[in-house]
């Protein structure tokens, strides 16, 4: 299947996260869980498990998802998104990490966009049957103020949205400043 690569996990890494997935799958309450329900289970864990957003989580080792889910319970968007994706894949939900920028400021005087490194963000996409790839922002479960709701990942129609969707005027790139 074309989705197989989005289920792959490196052998020997994050054994506690794999064990968590196995325990969730054995739980009778999850006996008929579909992909969307597994997303809900993971997001609920993030919301209620004492996880927090920080730009200074310390150094993670080779089992970074295990450290996030069980030890540190803290990280920034890359830690949260990658740990979420590893759990999704362990639950047999095709998932991938997406990185980009969320935000930016339009200068109305000269019509330039300023996108800063602080606007960088990482989130996840999961494959839902009949819907295709769906954006999920696990950081929003940990730090709603950092990212807002999932809907904020779908900006209002405009230059940046058009750029993301591939319908942008090529001249837009000339008006972006990093």
Predicted regions and their residues:
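Short, contiguous acidic/charged loop-to-helix segments that flank catalytic cores in large enzymes
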Residues: 67-76, 111-115
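Juxtamembrane membrane-insertion context
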Residues: 6-10, 50-52, 102-178
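Solvent-exposed, low-complexity, intrinsically disordered
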Residues: 68-71, 99, 178
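Acidic low-complexity segments
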Residues: 1-71
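Intrinsic-disorder/low-complexity, polar/charged segments
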Residues: 14, 34, 76, 171, ...
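Short capping/connector residues at structural and topological boundaries
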Residues: 58, 73-75, 106, 141
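Cysteine-centered nucleophilic/redox motifs
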Residues: 42, 73-101, 124
């Amino acid at each position: 299947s074309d989705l197989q690569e989005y289920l792959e996990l490196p052998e020997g890494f994050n054994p506690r996260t794999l064990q968590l997935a196995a325990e969730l799958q054995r739980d009778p309450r999850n006996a008929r869980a579909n992909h969307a329900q597994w997303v809900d289970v993971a997001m609920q864990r993030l919301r209620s498990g004492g996880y927090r957003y920080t730009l200074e989580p310390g150094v993670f080792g080779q089992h970074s998802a295990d450290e996030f889910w069980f030890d540190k319970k803290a990280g920034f968007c890359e830690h949260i998104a990658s740990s979420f994706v590893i759990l999704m894949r362990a639950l047999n939900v095709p998932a991938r990490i997406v990185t980009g920028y969320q935000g930016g400021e339009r200068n109305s005087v000269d019509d330039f966009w300023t996108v800063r490194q602080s606007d960088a963000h990482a989130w996840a996409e999961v494959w839902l049957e009949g819907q295709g790839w769906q954006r999920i922002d696990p950081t929003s479960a940990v730090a709603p103020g950092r990212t807002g709701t999932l809907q904020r990942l779908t900006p209002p129609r405009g230059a940046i949205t058009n750029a993301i969707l591939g319908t942008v005027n090529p001249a837009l790139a000339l008006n972006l400043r990093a």
